[in-house]
């Protein structure tokens, strides 16, 4: 059986790569899932007969479009927009919109594929999608971001809706951008519906939505730590990134008793051996969310911190690492440095931040390691809760949302334990998350026929 499964994986991947040449991020995401579920698939021949995996890796729809806009000098720019609607077997498409220079079709497909499994893990009725553009808001004025967002939504609005596809924010798309996108959708469609999530509290948003992904990472980490009778109390924590996910993961870890000593951005990282405090976190919120400055300014504000330009934080000794920046930020050397530095728990806040060879290092060392599709699902879970609140024209209290977020992250952890516990007791969270998500989506696809 094992040899057959291995041959099945290689044949499957050869065909996928031939059909999708040059899409290395998409290949990487698919291989991780296929390797995890191959034994399960070959054990149940009807899954092979129905070609479930072959159907899962083929998007139901890909929309690619031009986005023309003018800058403040009147100069015309053309960017490229995407929406990959991967799978709607268990609900309307759901997934973020990313505005970043690195955006391309491969990254959109990888993110939409990951989103399908992540959304299935939440147990909420949401399919998988992802969208975005190679436009970067960095260095742009509010007016330029607004004009771009309005142009982007002028095309995207044809393909989305509260029961069809519900986008949200992602890298480069925060509350400001969601506001501009929602305003243009409402203007064109003449309707006020829950078509986007991550909205402002005064116009259909959910309490705790900004905090949800970062908080959810820590709630999931608590469940992982409990399997080894550990907690955050007194632990040294590395956080990469300084955007939404990193900010709230750092804040929650700190409030759970950990000492958070790093934050980063694309230019480098800061190391504060004394650890973040509530006052320092408020400075980070103002720096990144209001002034949209660079993390090096933290070290200028707090002389006890050291700024490392052009580097990542993984060389710093720690107990727990929370990668919350971007895909493939932890390579093999970084993983070995983490292990050598005493790290025993890695919980992903970003999407696919760990390269396959680094995952192998973690699993060989028997670290607690969770993939983002499980541990960062709190964001989309709370987006799903926002959809529910919009449907009933109601707004829950922060306590209600937090309780639901806790429950969902705990349930995801239980699913990972069910399908990922190895014979020796080691918990393979990658395998557990992939099989749990796969089973739910596969069963729905079979029930709905060949569509």
Regions of interest found by a model, annotated:
Residues 2-29, 224, 339-451:
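Adenosine-phosphate binding glycine-rich loop
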Residues 24-27, 45-50, 123, 160-169, ...:
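Flexible, glycine/charged-enriched surface loops at secondary-structure junctions
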Residues 46-77:
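Structured beta-strand/loop patches that form or line metal/cofactor-binding pockets in enzymes
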Residues 100, 119-233:
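Glycine/serine-rich phosphate-binding loop and adjoining beta1-alpha1 elements at the start
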Residues 110, 164-168, 191-196, 239, ...:
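General beta-strand structural signal in soluble alpha/beta enzymes
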Residues 197-200, 205-315:
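Glycine-rich phosphate/diphosphate-binding loop of Rossmann-like nucleotide-binding domains
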Residues 268-369, 374:
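Rossmann-like adenosine-cofactor binding region
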